[in-house]
Amino acid sequence: MARISFSCLFPASWHCSLPSVTQFSRQRVALLIISVAVFILVFAAVADLQLWSSRAFRDRQFRRYLDQIEDLEATDTKDTKLNYGVVVDCGSSGSRVFVYFWPPHNGNPHDLLDIKQMRDRGSKPVVKKIKPGISTMALTPEKSSDYINPLLSFAASYIPKHKHKETPLYILCTAGMRILPESQQIAILQDLVKDVPQEFDFLFSEAHAEVISGKQEGVYAWISINFVLGRFDHVVDEEDAVVAVTIGTQEESIIRKRTVGVIDMGGGSLQIAYEVPTTMTYPSVEHEEVAKSMLAEFNLGCDLQHTEHVYRVYVTTFMGFGGNFARQRYEDMVFNDTITKNRIQGQQIGVHPNSPLQDPCLPVGLIDQVRRQSHDLHVLGKGNWDSCRQQLEPLLLKSNDTQAYLNSVYQPSIDFSNSEFYGFSEFFYCTEDVLRMGGIYNSQKFAKAAKEYCSMPWTTLQDRFNSGLYSSHADQHRLKYQCFKSAWMFSILHNGFHFPHEYPNFKTAQLVYDKEVQWTLGAILYKTRFLPLRDIRQESSRPAHVSWFRISFVYNHYLFFACILVVLLSIVLYILRLRRIHRRQARASALDLLLMEEGVHTVLEPGIPT
């Protein structure tokens, strides 16, 4: 190959030579340029896809924000496409009616109805409560429909009249009705089923009026919380926590959003509900029977063949483990123990005000009396939080086995490395009303604050209360029993349910997205789960047609870059083909030259003298 040399008066080692720029080198340069261009285009495509994904994520976040804002706006009853539903919660102390609405289903069998609570023109929730409870109609069941009439009239006034005939009505009775004999329950429900349709045009049948169990109520509450938090939306974003779920005998696990567990401590009872994602094994038939009575497996989807909305939830209610009832149990225990010790040891502790029993669960210096069986036990607050927790340990009634279950009730294990829980009612009041620590729970900070509160003199707490240093919801009852209830909450959470002290995913709350969430939302979600089938069938019966406007923006990008790659690949193949043709021509020229040289030698050979 010919070479082009550059020489100058430099040292010999500086002399250099460059290959001649031939057609081959030009092809190599062109191929290199095309390769770089392809790399740049592919890089741009990947970057654009990531940018699109980021924008899509921000769009979803923005839509969620808009949905939260829309939830607080007045319901547009002029929208003829809206559907409505009514749920009456017949509780022990009173009954409440809730009105819900939802737009037409989007036609995707994997999505649930978008049910929201109706709001009036002032953007207030449409809800009405009456007292006393419907259980007071036990002796006069024929008046049950008259009792509930004001609630239904209230709901009917907010729902467009032409929508009444297609609006389902559910009357669900809870604790107050459960304690009645079955005959009285049936008499009340029969009167409702007979008389309500004569007064109102709602969709209402015998199956729409029932007394639900505590287990059902817990499941509905669990559904409500997770629905509002968006945990049933199976579009998983990068920041969403997921869990692998096994359903029945399926070998492959379903990967979906992690649901939250719910712990609710009221005044009289304690309830816990959480998903059990894996199929359980039991050491004995007895354990299996007990576990099945506390597990609820249900499908929230409209298609029973689809298992992505099948959930297995553990629900248990502990009667007597609420904050106020636990205090009564504690006072009973202290009273009986003190009377017994006084009788055995001949002492007079607590009998007179000048020799009170020191109670570690009351603030320092607080004077109180416990009356049982016409006897008074005088107590004086000692304010020792650790000692209080020790005295509360027997009230947990834990089993003697290795699991040490709360109240000796079986509980499936919780994966504390991949779970999340919300604490409501007393959990929120204990952390927020006085300690002002509601929200994300930290056991060390909570224990420190609780100890400091308990050790404060009662007079100091009164001064702080009068100065407005506590929540507006705090009252004298809260100040008096905060020390006890904080110790009880701590014991329930860590000694009863065995939550690790460093567990990071427990939150105490009163509202979810600034609104109160009722179990009735979960009830209507479950009751109306098959309604989307109607919209899906209507959608499938329409003639299919293609709309270019429905093609995703990202697909256009894919098509654009695919076309560019095809063109570049064609250019590369064309250049390679030219190279092969050029090589063939070069070989042919070399062969011709060789043949010509051989021919010359052949001609010259005869004339050469020997």
From Swiss-Prot:
Record function comment? Catalyzes the hydrolysis of nucleoside triphosphates and diphosphates in a calcium- or magnesium-dependent manner. Preferentially hydrolyzes nucleoside 5'-triphosphates, with substrate preference for UTP > GTP > CTP. Hydrolyzes ATP and nucleoside diphosphates only to a minor extent.
Q: Where is the active site?
A: E217 (proton acceptor)
**What cofactors does the UniProt entry give for this protein?**
Ca(2+); Mg(2+)
Q: Where in the cell is it found?
A: Cytoplasmic vesicle membrane
Protein encoded by which gene: entpd7
The SS bond pairs are C454-C483
- Vesicular domain ranges by topology: 50-555
Indicate which residues are glycosylated according to the record.
N336, N400
* Protein's GO biological process: CTP catabolic process; GTP metabolic process; nucleobase-containing small molecule catabolic process; UTP catabolic process
Q: Where do the TM regions start and end? A: 29-49, 556-576
Q: How does it sit in the membrane?
A: Multi-pass membrane protein
What is the main EC category here? Answer: hydrolase
Of which family is this protein a member? Belongs to the GDA1/CD39 NTPase family.
Can you tell which superkingdom this protein's organism belongs to?
Eukaryota
Protein name according to UniProt: Ectonucleoside triphosphate diphosphohydrolase 7
Record's GO cellular component terms: cytoplasmic vesicle membrane
Task: Give the E.C. number(s).
Answer: 3.6.1.15
Q: Name one GO molecular function term.
A: metal ion binding
Keywords, ordered alphabetically: Calcium, Cytoplasmic vesicle, Disulfide bond, Glycoprotein, Hydrolase, Magnesium, Membrane, Metal-binding, Transmembrane, Transmembrane helix
CDD domains under this entry? ASKHA_NBD_NTPDase4-like
Does this UniProt record's set of keywords contain Transport?
no
Q: One Pfam family, short name please?
A: GDA1_CD39
Cytoplasmic face: residue ranges?
1-28, 577-610
Q: Write out the catalysed reaction.
A: a ribonucleoside 5'-triphosphate + H2O = a ribonucleoside 5'-diphosphate + phosphate + H(+); UTP + H2O = UDP + phosphate + H(+); GTP + H2O = GDP + phosphate + H(+); CTP + H2O = CDP + phosphate + H(+)
